[in-house]
Amino acid sequence: MNPLKILIWNANGISRKAKDVELFAHNKKVDILLVTELRLKRGETVKIYGYAYYPAYRPSLNNNSVGGVAVFVRTTLRHFPQRVIETRHIQLSSVKVATGLGDLQFSAIYCSPSTRIEERHFTDIIRACGQRYLVGGDWNARHWLWGDTCNSPRGRELAEALSVTGAKILATGSPTRYPYVPSHTPSCIDFAVYHGIPDHLATITQSWDLDSDHLPLIISIETDSTHVNPSPRLVTKHTDLLAFSRQLESLISLNTTLNSGEEIEMAVDNLTESIHRAAAVSTSPVPRIGTTYGIVLTREARELLTQKRRLRRRAIRSQDPWDRLLWNRAAKQLRNVLRELRSNFFEQKLASMDYTVDAGYSLWKCTKSLKRQPFRQVPIRCPGGELAKNEEEQANCFANHLETRFTHFQFATTEQYQETLDSLETPLQMSLPIKPIRVEEIVEAIKSLPLKKSPGIDNVCNATLKALPVRAILYLALIYNAILRVQFFPKQWKMAAILMIHKPGKPEESPESYRPISLLSSLSKLWERLIANRLNDIMTERRILPDHQFGFRQGHSTVEQVHRLTKHILQAFDDKEYCNAVFIDMQQAFDRVWHDGLISKVKKLFPAPYYGVLKSYLEDRRFMVRVRNSYSIPRVMRAGVPQGSVLGPLLYSVFTADLPCPNAYHMADPRKALLATYADDIALLYSSNCCNEAARGLQEYLTTLAAWCKRWILKVNPQKTINPCFTLKTLSPVTAPIELEGVILDQPSQAKYLGITLDKRLTFGPHLKATTRRCYQRMQQLRWLLNRKSTMTLRAKRAVYVHCVAPIWLYGIQIWGIAAKSNYNRIQVLQNRAMRAITDCPYYVRGTTLHRDLNLHTVEEQISRHTSRYSDRLRRHHSILARRLLPARPLRRLKRKGFAKTLGQP
């Protein structure tokens, strides 16, 4: 049994000491760090490899870097953050850790020495920690109970609070602070108070390793700690695939009949259980490996560390300036050696990085971790106002929020509701059964599955599906065809595990600030792929989806849809017209889809057998929210298409297929209107010689759209719906305001649609400025890889730029390629700087030489290459709207560059 180690230390400013703390924590195998007096501004963070960071800042008017505490917890420990106290008097951060003694709360506390803290304040803080806790830090309180030579007023107040609460003291009994000023006396103000921990299990010692006027204290508690169990994969590199296939074939019997829903569910359980049993037998157990730290102290470093400890003790006891000088020299020499150790380790790691198989794709693993959004677990606020105290409460709080979200609005009238329900009661027309699923289809679909996908609750991932033997695939075909024949979807595949991802910039305590990510069964999504192919064929044959819908359709992309908008705007510029636009935001569109309304449209548009299958697929779907290893109580999804599924986007497109199109009722000339939809992103443009006439046409359409949304229980968010006007007029047009649900829409000078910023004059200057800013931010993240002194190979550096930086500005190059050279030249400057950082070349080396040696294209060459390929794709496009985007060499009034000139046409 490894004891749980806790560090208590006043850092006296941690910014320049973080690397020393990291090395100390890993070499001493410390599990929890209670660090006080960080002296960080609000928002500043400290990264210690292998530890999660939970701070509490001291409030100040000017956001000064004073006070503050933080708890660092090893990421492998199962823990949950608790309340935070941030006042001028006290800063406290708490984390609850699962141990062999039960849930134990660890808190870091810092009490400001210049303020008065009474006994009741200490009592309230200690009592709020629960029955089992350890609170350690810098109390700035002196008393003989914890080994000080005198009693201060705050010490007497704290001693009284400890007597009232029954908390015990854990201290060294000797001074923990040795001030730098010789006239000040040493004091014992760093210690811990605890409750619910047996006295014989906790010990405390002091160390002389870290540099501060406070000594670090190490507490050891003889108890086990509970570690986070990562979701185990059934088939790993330690699995004997041949043994797995043989074992699974022996467990599956094809002599079965599936003629009812109960039999289908039993077959699904049998298949899932057999896969688990076969994987358990054929996979070798692998011991859990904790977080490894690559830097190892050399013999020289250990000797210098011992020497520094000895000189520090002597300098503190003697208070001799010469002894202090020797101590500072030894500390400086040790810092230089440790800096060299870290530098050598870093250089070796960079030199070994590559994107090849032999290097284990170490380069891509490293860059992927940089792009991934950092996870910081924060307790959210429940509906009652209190904060969640553990993972189960957090999961159920999220589930309560999502259960409300997965409920359709109440907009339609009683007559409209009844009309939809009556349509569901009408008899179905005779139709041929759904085409059976062949084994060859399943095999081809499995081959195309991506490996890096998380499994659902059944833990059957895509790698497991790729290892299935022939007998298992035959059994799977029996289940799939039984679902089509019986028109029953098994309940096991209707359960979703939902992870909540924080939206950057949103308040962390609010459930609305998190985005749900659903994890569904891979067996279910494989069936959905096969059914989606059949549905797509029917939709193409019957032309169910409108041409203006480009979302989730084969051969359609965001670039073509934005191209339609820009071409319409440029035509309005040529015709000396205003182009008024409305960019519509649908509120929670996918999560609020009305099931009865969707099923009624499926019944009307598709053959009869699909009605029963999709009705069973949508009914009684459930979900559970997962927070680390804890799940919420199962909840019901009463509305919405399954998020994370294959059929979800397709069903949403079917649900919105009858979206109203602009016509003569709305506008004087509907030919000058353009409707563009990409899933739930809707844009409507209308050009006219009079900006107010264009506004009236848009207003009439929005009135019709609002009535359609009310009929099908969808909601438009007027706060996020905008009404820009595109024009080349030097004076800003005074357009008539447009209302939606009684709210006047904002009229900004630019709009962002599908990742492309469209400004008023369509110069793409704001878009290129924002894109360049994002590229510089990404290069700053990758600076440790792409700097001039990096030991990584030139080939690997080039690969990092090409695959991690260049795609940011290459997106939409077919559209913004018509911009003036002065606008996109900033991208070229960015690339030039990146090339010089990669190669570390002298200033006199020309940019053309760098482009040639690194085999990189200039921005102008990239524009020509991508637009040429784009033009070829448009010529072969099966959508008539996409083919119309091809330049027709029109007579242009303006001398500005258009799409035809970008493609090299006159």
Swiss-Prot record:
Catalytic activity: DNA(n) + a 2'-deoxyribonucleoside 5'-triphosphate = DNA(n+1) + diphosphate
Domain of life: Eukaryota
Pfam families per UniProt: Exo_endo_phos, RVT_1
One GO-annotated biological process of the protein: DNA transposition
PROSITE patterns referenced in this protein's UniProt entry, alphabetically: RT_POL
EC number from the UniProt entry: 2.7.7.49
Keyword annotations of the record: Nucleotidyltransferase, RNA-directed DNA polymerase, Transferase, Transposable element
GO molecular function list: RNA-directed DNA polymerase activity
Name this protein carries in UniProt: Probable RNA-directed DNA polymerase from transposon BS
Species in which this protein is naturally found: Drosophila melanogaster (Fruit fly)
SUPFAM superfamilies: DNA/RNA polymerases, DNase I-like
Domain Reverse transcriptase: 482-758
InterPro entries: DNA/RNA_pol_sf, Endo/exonu/phosph_ase_sf, Endo/exonuclease/phosphatase, RdDP_mobile_element, RT_dom
Entry cofactors: Mg(2+); Mn(2+)
